[in-house]
Amino acid sequence: MAKLTQEEILEAIAGMTVLELSELVKAVEDKFGVKAAAPAVAVAAAAPAAAAAEEKTEFNVELTSAAADKKIAVIKVVREITGLGLKEAKDLVDGAPKVIKENVAKAEAEEMKKKVTEAGGVVTLK
């Protein structure tokens, strides 16, 4: 039997369908008694904990509630922030708690919170 080069093997694999590749992987696992799964690395498990310790940079600005007597002022501010029409802004305020804006920088989120709070709404940053 002629010995195949790595290049020839790679070319043959490149021409296979996904189903054929799946069958090849199973055959290699059976023949050599190995698993195709990558080994878990202990360092990778520590990375999410370190990421959680970092300060959050993007926030969702959520309108929690609006005082009944200040609802019109809150609707105006929500329209200004979101660019929504009158009906959409009213529906958002009436349906609180609802997210006003998602993935906003911290400074911008704080500014939005200040505006809505001054108008009579209650905002949480998530």
Swiss-Prot record:
InterPro entries membership: Ribosomal_bL12, Ribosomal_bL12_C, Ribosomal_bL12_C/ClpS-like, Ribosomal_bL12_oligo, Ribosomal_bL12_oligo_N_sf
Biological process, per Gene Ontology: translation
Keyword list, A-Z: Ribonucleoprotein, Ribosomal protein
Matches recorded under Gene3D superfamilies: 3.30.1390.10, Single helix bin
CDD domains found in the cross-reference section: Ribosomal_L7_L12
Gene Ontology MF, one: mRNA binding
GO terms under cellular component: cytosolic large ribosomal subunit
Superkingdom of source: Bacteria
TM annotation in the entry: none
NCBIfam families to which the protein is assigned, alphabetical: L12
Subunit structure: Homodimer. Part of the ribosomal stalk of the 50S ribosomal subunit. Forms a multimeric L10(L12)X complex, where L10 forms an elongated spine to which 2 to 4 L12 dimers bind in a sequential fashion. Binds GTP-bound translation factors.
Family: Belongs to the bacterial ribosomal protein bL12 family.
Protein name: Large ribosomal subunit protein bL12
Species in which this protein is naturally found: Elusimicrobium minutum (strain Pei191)
Primary gene name: rplL
